[in-house]
Amino acid sequence: MGEHMDVTMDTRRAHEYFLNELCYSIGPKGLKEKIKNDVNSFNLIDVRGYDDYIDGHIPFAMHVPYDELEEHFNMFSKEKVNIIYSYSIVCQLAKKCAVKLTEKGYPVMELIGGFKAW
């Protein structure tokens, strides 16, 4: 195959990717359970636009738009997980926020499917 092996054929990297995705994501059902049983153990962060947040959001979610994230690091906790969501499964805003937060040492999970899946 040579040094230009198709990345999709690299089963070791694929295994690591999917294992990490399972560890750092939560589905709507899992989030509903956390809200019901242990709402104080995490922060829920909606990174969508203001109008979308006002039109509807997940209970207990704080609004921190993606483009204002760095101005609001003080709202997050390093002592509990910060669950981030954006619009839908195709939206990358939550992942981009997760990168920024983890660079600063904040524990993060992503809601699979975003608000649309909720």
Predicted segments with their positions:
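Conserved beta-strand positions in the Rossmann-like core of class I SAM-dependent methyltransferases
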Residues: N43, M62, M109
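Glycine-rich, highly charged phosphate/nucleotide-binding loops
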Residues: V64-E70
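Catalytic cysteine-centered active loop of the rhodanese-like fold, especially the PTP/DSP P-loop
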Residues: F73-W118
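Flexible, polar/low-complexity N-terminal or interdomain linker segments that lie immediately upstream
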Residues: M1-N43, R48-D52
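Short hydrophobic/charged patches on amphipathic alpha-helices used for structural packing
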Residues: K32, E70-N74
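Short loop/helix-cap segments at secondary-structure boundaries that form the rim of catalytic
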Residues: Y53-P59, F76
